Amino acid sequence: MPFLWLCWALWALSLVSLREALTGEQILGSLLQQLQLDQPPVLDKADVEGMVIPSHVRTQYVALLQHSHASRSRGKRFSQNLREVAGRFLVSETSTHLLVFGMEQRLPPNSELVQAVLRLFQEPVPRTALRRQKRLSPHSARARVTIEWLRFRDDGSNRTALIDSRLVSIHESGWKAFDVTEAVNFWQQLSRPRQPLLLQVSVQREHLGPGTWSSHKLVRFAAQGTPDGKGQGEPQLELHTLDLKDYGAQGNCDPEAPVTEGTRCCRQEMYLDLQGMKWAENWILEPPGFLTYECVGSCLQLPESLTSRWPFLGPRQCVASEMTSLPMIVSVKEGGRTRPQVVSLPNMRVQTCSCASDGALIPRRLQP
């Protein structure tokens, strides 16, 4: 029975939408998971009477409180503008290129990124080279193109993150599009002043084995403009963004105005009283209650001209885009003695409400 009780609590926690108000059941489910308990402990008043919270426990609790107000975790982010950034090849080797894009002031203020597309121009392969390749490697006519985001760290080392990878035919030529939205999301998380956006383009064999070594060498991307001097072959980075002045949320709700269907997406303040919950009695020492928030209201939907361009995006909804943790002091009974313990429940309080679409990319957090 206790196991079934825990399963129910965690199931209820998983069903909660990011736009709904935080409930006592969610707090309980997270606490049970954090403390690895099957059910809430039953503590008598005598167990906690006269208990003094040590200064180091109080200090830890206050530090977590301060950190929760400064540290935020991002949830789903969603960003009619199209901007192209010309890139240049910094390094060109047999099968690896490093593209450099100057990004400062390229993203409009008060906007969010919907999609970033890298366009590379694949040069046609001379017919003589194709005939020779077919004679030497008849079963290999494709190569794998991989896009990675490259980051140089302060200590001089570098890290890469896989962004996109696909097979291209040596018999094709023209513009090839790669989705590099995640790379731009990573770049946005860098501290200022930000380094340029670095994208590493690698051309490799489709698979290992004899007779496949030469095909990938025939795949080449234009590094400069076409012979007519118009620069049409240069690598291009397209940035698709939405103006949040029209499509974003408004911040905190007006406490004097009732929330209706026409209310623009906002963060509504609420108070969760833990003292009034039976399961928290004699177990939750701090806080007795706290301010919590929910995301309410509606969002302006995209016009048909944009939904047809981005068919992967669903209806826009008012959701929590940034969450923060909730520190607590609880009573823990061990060996007949009761002591206070600090726990921190992640993603419990809404910090920011935003308008987002189903299907929008959820960015990965940038690792140190």
UniProtKB/Swiss-Prot annotation:
CDD domains in the record: TGF_beta_LEFTY1_2
GO molecular function: cytokine activity; growth factor activity; nodal binding; transforming growth factor beta receptor binding
Keywords of the record: Cytokine, Developmental protein, Disulfide bond, Glycoprotein, Growth factor, Secreted, Signal
PROSITE patterns linked: TGF_BETA_1 (PS00250), TGF_BETA_2 (PS51362)
UniProt entry tagged with the keyword Disulfide bond: yes
Coiled coil: none
Predominant location category: secreted
Cysteine disulfide links: 253-266, 265-318, 295-353, 299-355
Listed GO CC annotations: extracellular region; extracellular space
InterPro entries: Cystine-knot_cytokine, LRDF, TGF-b_C, TGF-b_propeptide, TGF-beta-rel, TGFb_CS
Propeptide, chain numbering: 22-76
Subcellular location: Secreted
GO process terms (BP): anterior/posterior axis specification; cell migration involved in gastrulation; cell population proliferation; determination of left/right symmetry; heart morphogenesis; negative regulation of cell population proliferation; negative regulation of nodal receptor complex assembly; negative regulation of nodal signaling pathway
Entry's transmembrane regions: none
SUPFAM superfamilies per the UniProt record, alphabetical: Cystine-knot cytokines
Glycoprotein recorded as keyword: yes
Glycosylation site positions: 158
Post-translational modifications reported in the UniProt record: The processing of the protein may also occur at the second R-X-X-R site located at AA 132-135. Processing appears to be regulated in a cell-type specific manner.
Endpoints of the signal sequence: 1-21
Similarity-based family: Belongs to the TGF-beta family.
Function per UniProt: Required for left-right axis determination as a regulator of LEFTY2 and NODAL.
UniProt protein name: Left-right determination factor 1
Species this protein is from: Mus musculus (Mouse)
